[in-house]
Amino acid sequence: MRTEYCGQLRQSHVGQQVTLCGWVNRRRDLGSLIFIDMRDREGIVQVFFDPDRADALKLASELRNEFCIQVTGTVRAREEKNINADMATGAIEVLASDLTIINRSESLPLDSNHVNTEEARLKYRYLDLRRPEMAQRLKIRAKITSFVRRFMDDHGFLDIETPMLTKATPEGARDYLVPSRVHKGKFYALPQSPQLFKQLLMMSGFDRYYQIVKCFRDEDLRADRQPEFTQIDVETSFMTAPQVREIMEAMVRQLWLEIKGVDLGDFPIMTFAEAERRYGSDKPDLRNPIELVDVADLLKSVEFAVFAGPANDPKGRVAALRVPGGASLTRKLIDEYGNFVKIYGAKGLAYIKVTERAKGMDGINSPVAKFLTAEIVEAILERTGAQDGDMIFFGADNKKVVADALGALRLKLGKDLSLTDESKWAPLWVIDFPMFEDDGEGGLTAMHHPFTSPKDMTADELKAAPEEAVANAYDMVINGYEVGGGSVRIHRGDMQQTVFGILGINEHEQREKFGFLLDALKYGTPPHAGLAFGLDRLTMLLTGTDNIRDVIAFPKTTAAACLMTEAPSFANPAALGELGIQVVEKEAKASLENK
């Protein structure tokens, strides 16, 4: 039906007859002439109808926005005064000789001249996706997956599919469960990741695997999370962690060159401990120059319990955050930032405004200055590198609260005060994460997942001191987003059972949930390591949006609902009966529980 795409016409096509298919983006009726901007997935071209083609001109008078049409005509060069430099096709236009209205459109529920609500965009997603910016995002997503497949094929990786209907295994979030009709009372789980299957593929001898795969997690949603998401999943045998990082870094660097024309350079490597200490985050945005600076040793003897308490507590921390030019912040803004850090558990925000450092105590303004000596203030200013016009904020609490609160404040200040250089790309690897973290109930939970290997520890050493264990894990971070994460996996049965035991999974549960894995580990399992990238997050970065729903064709809301199809929906009672499932209403359930 077409010979060319609208958006691909150029001056090289001048004089050629073309047939185009697409939609009316805009129509301008000048009486004897009618102009339309005609759109398809590749872009927009101007088409005009003149009196010499009376039938086409008459039919064109009926055109309205979003009519689906076919046009045949001749490509002509525009007069120089009419060239539109803002359009890729702005140097040419198409003189229409034939017009077919394929399908008419009713008045649109979306307004192309105004910003539509996200609810409206999601409800009429098929119309929202017609917008050029949305089409461009999905085209870039397609380019990313195409590039990844080429790269992986060139490096000897095999694309192998793993099951969608599998067994529920604890991986940190709730599973989406699928009832079995054949095995009544039993359920499949949709995979949170192909983690165990890709490890089993390594045990099967497929030493380089990849898959671009859908994953599912029934968790509380955030702006950058979806219940179903796509991973670029990778696993290798007989490769060390540095070797895995090297090949995956090469892939991402080449991807950025292909999509953005940018060389990211070598990725710096930072330990988890350093990232938390300097940036209050395990995914630091290195475009932001603000850093956390420890000052507890300077404040142990002050007569100010807010500082002295954490400064003398082994589990406490006092850190300073120097904000260049921050002395200009108003009291109202300072109070707002104080309320902001309370979200992260901080009790407030002490500060020092540096107006004229050379004047010592007379050159600062601070509500806590009365508790500090001139020597302590000078030491703080020296350590933080404070200059005239700077602001120093303080966090004093347990280590986690200080890191979380000042880390979040750092990001907010970077954005609010335009300190973060958004023209740059800042990738890095974060390594050496703690193996376990406190689960809040006196036990331990895996910081990544239960199949991550500890670094340089035997099973006996791990059992004796699990809190000291460092995971052989690594995350790739770009501009403050974790775009990929992975680890060296456990490949010995005794180590895997030790980790399960530390996590409170008894032997019976181990056999019930992971018996197939423990059995597989008995038969010459090779050392293996891998990584998974979030395709959605990569696409967000490469398209310049901060909303994950902008890079997914048909996303869910933050309530895990599809406004277009109205999913989830109630199931047919007969279908539920076949599955052996009965829906219990809340009132009935409450009465049963009260009996």
UniProtKB/Swiss-Prot annotation:
Positions contributing to L-aspartate binding: E171, R217, H448, R489
GO molecular function: aspartate-tRNA ligase activity; ATP binding; nucleic acid binding
InterPro entries: Aa-tRNA-synt_II (IPR004364), aa-tRNA-synth_II (IPR006195), aa-tRNA-synth_II/BPL/LPL (IPR045864), Asp-tRNA-ligase_1 (IPR004524), Asp-tRNA-ligase_1_N (IPR047089), Asp/Asn-tRNA-synth_IIb (IPR002312), AspRS_core (IPR047090), GAD-like_sf (IPR004115)
Gene3D superfamilies, A to Z: Bira Bifunctional Protein, Domain 2, GAD-like domain, Nucleic acid-binding proteins
Class of enzymatic activity (EC top level): ligase
KW ATP-binding (keyword) present: yes
Keywords for this protein: Aminoacyl-tRNA synthetase, ATP-binding, Cytoplasm, Ligase, Nucleotide-binding, Protein biosynthesis
EC identifiers of the protein: 6.1.1.12
Compartment(s) of residence: Cytoplasm
Chain spans, region Aspartate: 195-198
Binding site for ATP: R217, D218, E219, Q226, E482, G534, L535, D536, R537
GO cellular component terms attached to this protein's record: cytoplasm
Enzymatic reactions: tRNA(Asp) + L-aspartate + ATP = L-aspartyl-tRNA(Asp) + AMP + diphosphate
An individual GO BP term: aspartyl-tRNA aminoacylation
Cited Pfam families: GAD (PF02938), tRNA-synt_2 (PF00152), tRNA_anti-codon (PF01336)
Function: Catalyzes the attachment of L-aspartate to tRNA(Asp) in a two-step reaction: L-aspartate is first activated by ATP to form Asp-AMP and then transferred to the acceptor end of tRNA(Asp).
Subunit comment: Homodimer.
Protein family membership: Belongs to the class-II aminoacyl-tRNA synthetase family. Type 1 subfamily.
Record protein name field: Aspartate--tRNA ligase
Native species: Klebsiella pneumoniae (strain 342)
